[in-house]
Curated annotation (Swiss-Prot):
InterPro entries: Ribosomal_uS14, Ribosomal_uS14_bac/plastid
Keywords annotated in UniProt: Ribonucleoprotein, Ribosomal protein, RNA-binding, rRNA-binding
Origin superkingdom: Bacteria
Official protein name in the record: Small ribosomal subunit protein uS14
GO molecular function list: rRNA binding; structural constituent of ribosome
Function: Binds 16S rRNA, required for the assembly of 30S particles and may also be responsible for determining the conformation of the 16S rRNA at the A site.
One Gene Ontology cellular component: small ribosomal subunit
Similarity comment text for this entry: Belongs to the universal ribosomal protein uS14 family.
Gene (UniProt): rpsN
Native organism: Xylella fastidiosa (strain Temecula1 / ATCC 700964)
An example Gene Ontology biological process: translation
Length: 101
């Protein structure tokens, strides 16, 4: 089980990333646009730098929904490998079964 503070920190980052997503996208469009002038690009990059660090989506970490484990998480299910195996063995996930060959 991950520390509660780490899980809460990640939830805070998700909220901030969602809150500033539109603003961040518009500033990045101005920066990468060929039509905008050099001064506009500099101004947009300064505004982008002043946004909170945690609002960047690259700072997010995929975590298991049940245990909060940061590694070995299957995006399709949102579960860590251990919890996914337990759920599959109980039959909680329809269509998923243990491989056998």
């Amino acid at each position: 089980m991950a520390k509660i503070s780490m899980i809460n920190r990640d939830l805070k980052r998700k909220r901030l990333a969602k809150k500033f997503a539109d603003k961040r996208l518009s500033l990045k469009k101005v920066i990468s646009s060929y039509a905008s002038s050099y001064e506009e690009k500099i101004e947009a990059s300064c505004k982008l730098q002043k946004l909170p660090r945690d609002s960047s989506p690259t700072r997010l970490r995929n975590r298991c929904e049940i245990s909060g484990r940061p590694r070995g998480v299957y995006c399709k299910f949102g579960l860590g490998r251990n919890k996914l195996r337990e759920a599959a063995m109980r039959g909680d996930i329809p269509g998923l079964r243990k491989a056998s060959w």
